[in-house]
Amino acid sequence: MKKKFVAIMMVAAMAASMAACGSDGGSSDTQKGGSSTTTSDVANKDKPLVWFNRQPSNSSTGELDTTALNYNKDTYYVGFDANQGAELQGEMVKEYIEKNNDTIDRNGDGVIGYVLAIGDIGHNDSIARTRGVRKALGTGVDKSGEIDSAPAGTNSDGKAAEVQDGKITVNGKDYVVRELASQEMKNSAGATWDAATAGNAIGTWSSSFGESIDVVVSNNDGMGMSMFNAWSKDNKVPTFGYDANSDAVAAIAEGYGGTISQHADVQAYLTLRVLRNALDGVDIDTGIGTEDDAGNVLSDDVYVYKDDERSYYALNVAVTADNYKDFTDSTVVWAPVSKQLDSGKHPTKKVWLNIYNASDNFLSSTYQPLLQKYDDLLNLDVEYIGGDGQTESNITNRLGNPSQYDAFAINMVKTDNAASYTALLNQ
């Protein structure tokens, strides 16, 4: 304790000496050459901010919230390429059907029936994944120039307005592809992407459709695994999810059809890296597309940056029986960006970060463990806040004093609600 006290006194003395010396030039919020912002130097509204996992947007139209994405000069979004991943999931399901055409039609009626668990009808990623599956299987219908992503309810007769019957031809044989049922998995408290609701839904669907269900598709692995464990596994029905959660990847050996890795290892790195760069006052591409002083750099086949959207997107990879052993641990950091930053050049800074739902399987079991590994490598002292998945106030009420933080990483409950957070920073 004595050594620690002496060290603190020395730092204080040095700071006082530097302040007395003054400076030749004008002050600025961020400085070059390894210096960084401090909480006392910068107004909360000017501090680095990254939105992640849930892109600020209109939940009805999907239109990006450009005000939130351009909140200040150090604001960015980090997620994954939703459309690329969605199309990949759809193609993965289609290819599985084509490769297993001899056994996929369980009741031999010539109709490949599938059920679909939709995460959140107002979430861009959920919308994209629903569209991706319907596009690949030919079951999508046009609505205002886009594939309709609304739940079809029950559709045993193929007459639902939200979907149509598709067709797949394999070895000269035609199969009808029908979305037998789909619904948003929202629980009674309002939480979406709800695994328990999906588990209950597959019980209802299996009672109604029986052996007409040939494939189960889910917008994520949390819901997918709930349905797999509740029904699909015992009935040997291939189930497809999204996120490459460790339990889902392991379940591929037991009949889980496949999943999509959204490169959470790259996303988590980017989430904290853009903050680190802004705090250091260096080019935003440092340690991303350009090698940093520790040797960290990402190759352009694992991410894209869209300047007009101020958004970094990780690219997706299909995980199937052919390659699942390469993805068994979803919490391993991405090797090309695993080098420790020098604390002398990149001093510790404090970050406030929230997870919209502490019970979300992907965010809690994959994303946050990765963040916690990267925060050490990037010398960031991160305070993690877990929400209830239902209300923004459950999270915003715990951001009582933004002034004690150097930067913010925000994962909203609803994509429309960016203003709930920026209002706090504007005070």
Predicted feature residues:
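Sec-dependent N-terminal signal peptides of Gram-positive bacterial secreted proteins and lipoproteins
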Residues: 4-24
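A residue-level marker of the well-folded mature domains of exported/periplasmic proteins
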Residues: 21-427
